[in-house]
Swiss-Prot record:
GO biological process, one term: protein-containing complex assembly
UniProt entry keywords in alphabetical sequence: Nitrogen fixation
Pathway assigned in UniProt: Cofactor biosynthesis; Fe-Mo cofactor biosynthesis
UniProt record similarity statement: Belongs to the NifD/NifK/NifE/NifN family.
Domain of life: Archaea
Main function: This protein may play a role in the biosynthesis of the prosthetic group of nitrogenase (FeMo cofactor).
Lineage, top ranks: Archaea, Methanobacteriati, Methanobacteriota, Stenosarchaea group, Methanomicrobia
The protein's name in its UniProt record: Nitrogenase iron-molybdenum cofactor biosynthesis protein NifE
The keyword Calcium is annotated on this UniProt entry: no
Cystine residue pairs: none
Molecular function via GO: nitrogenase activity
Length: 463
């Protein structure tokens, strides 16, 4: 029998991507930010999928995939994002490229598809996604979209997301490049007015970037800022419209939640328009409190600071009895976290700590060295940290680390279920809000319900 060496039995080339927590100040010996190893069955997605997952929540845009029908089907309604108005984004459109289009080109087919969509749906924006085939045969997406924009006098925006041209992170950048085209440039005088100290007589304005309104999350966050006297211009891209996105440059500050998917946009807006940004999270008591206080401190208004503290005192006192009740039931349980990006992973560590639970496995698909160092400092001794894990590695880690609960996305759900381990979907497929104060109560209840379910008594707990 083959002897198992290391943290998990895996391919030799994969071992550098799995390690344990390091002491603060020590460099984490973890491989990351590389292309997936061939044959390792990565959970990552392609460039196109990364772009689509960011842009899909733009509610009244038409999302047209220039490529085979499978690409459009794979990402249909991918975010689970809710809309307060029109839901054009929930219909997926494709040019359905065939072999003949590969031979003779698909530009004419794309142009005809755009004409038909404008006639039927009258959208303010059409987002046209390129796929692997488009990159290979060389269709001029830019030219077709420019001609269509002039013909129909609407934004027809190319999203340069050829799937083979990188990984999911490159898709995030392609999405941000597309969003740049939708933002209306303010006058130079307005740009010069941007300042960190906003007079109390003026209502400050912010954008929330990297929040996709999954299950309605944004609707629990925006009211908190409105109560502070701060206007939220747009949440990108959750429940957003092209009209709201066009106003993004009017903001005094950008709050960035999912830094992995949106980091390019706030950096560009800071360089281009002088709008600063702060990283923020709206999950868990500690991170919500930090987000409100840092925003209030930035604007420097004593009235805004006072309102922030009043909100925190009221809301924390309101939810603590329920959080304490759940904490008594789940205290000491072990959790495994596997997320697409590091921002969610880091905020979940704090959330589980507030519930008295221990994180024993944590991994992401797109984390960078600095992200994993921060993760390493935030978890307890013995915690396994993994980059770009495959299903077999995750399954063995869940067994070895004796996890009671796995928090991940839909692709990892069945790994946990097959092992008889409780599961909580933190990503696209959930139907309950997890952000804001009520959202954290929802999360705590779902964790409790999953761990405490009697079904686990009827299945084999360990292999």
């Amino acid at each position: 029998m083959k002897e198992k060496i290391g943290i998990v039995d895996t391919l030799e080339e994969r071992k550098p991507y799995i390690t344990r927590k390091q002491e603060k100040g020590q460099e984490i010996p973890l491989g990351c930010d590389n292309n997936s190893l061939a044959g390792a069955i990565s959970q990552r997605a392609c460039v196109y999928s990364g772009a689509r997952v960011v842009l899909n929540p733009v509610t009244d845009a038409v999302h047209l995939v220039h490529g085979p029908i499978g690409c459009a089907g794979y990402t249909w309604d991918i975010r689970g994002a809710k809309s307060s108005g029109i839901e054009t984004n929930r219909t997926s459109f494709s040019t359905d490229m065939k072999e003949i289009d590969v031979v003779f080109g698909g530009e004419k087919k794309l142009s005809n598809a755009i004409d038909e969509l404008v006639e039927v749906y009258h959208p303010p924006v059409i987002l046209v996604y390129s796929t692997c085939i488009v990159g290979i045969i060389g269709d001029d997406l830019e030219s077709v979209c420019k001609t269509a924009s002039q013909k129909h006098t609407i934004h027809v925006t190319p999203v340069k997301s050829e799937g083979f041209n990188g990984n999911k992170s490159d898709g995030y950048k392609a999405a941000c490049d597309a969003l740049k085209r939708l933002i209306k440039r303010p006058s130079e005088d307005e740009i010069k007015k941007k300042a960190p100290r906003v007079p109390e007589t003026i209502k400050p304005k912010i954008n929330i970037l990297g929040d996709f309104n999954v299950a309605g999350d944004v609707w629990l966050v925006n009211p908190l800022f409105e109560q502070m006297g701060i206007e939220v211009i747009v949440s990108m891209t959750g429940d957003s419209t092209p009209k709201a996105i066009s106003r993004a440059a009017e903001a005094d500050l950008n709050l960035v939640q999912c830094s992995g998917s949106m980091t390019y946009l706030p950096k560009w807006m800071q360089a281009e328009y002088g709008i600063p940004y702060l990283n923020a999270s709206f999950f868990g008591i500690e991170d919500i409190s930090l987000a409100l206080r840092r925003t209030a401190d930035y604007f420097g208004s004593e009235e805004i600071k006072k309102r922030a503290e009043q909100i925190l005192e009221t809301e924390i006192n309101r939810i603590m009895p329920e959080i304490s009740r759940v904490r008594e039931k789940v205290k000491g349980k072990k959790a495994a976290i596997y997320m697409g990006g590091p921002a969610k992973a880091l905020t979940l560590i704090k959330g589980f700590d507030e519930l008295g639970m221990e994180v024993v496995i944590i991994g992401t698909q797109t984390g960078k060295k600095e992200d994993y160092e921060q993760i390493s400092y935030s978890v307890r001794d013995g915690t396994v940290i993994v980059d770009d894990a495959n299903p077999l590695e995750l399954a063995e880690l869940l067994i070895r680390q004796k996890a009671d609960l796995m928090v991940a996305g839909v692709k990892e759900r069945f790994i946990a279920y097959k092992l008889g381990i409780a599961f909580c979907d933190f990503n696209h497929d959930r139907v309950v809000e997890f952000e804001g104060f009520d959202g954290f109560v929802n999360f705590a209840r779902e964790v409790d319900a999953s761990i405490s379910s009697p079904v686990w008594k009827a299945v084999r707990q360990r292999i």
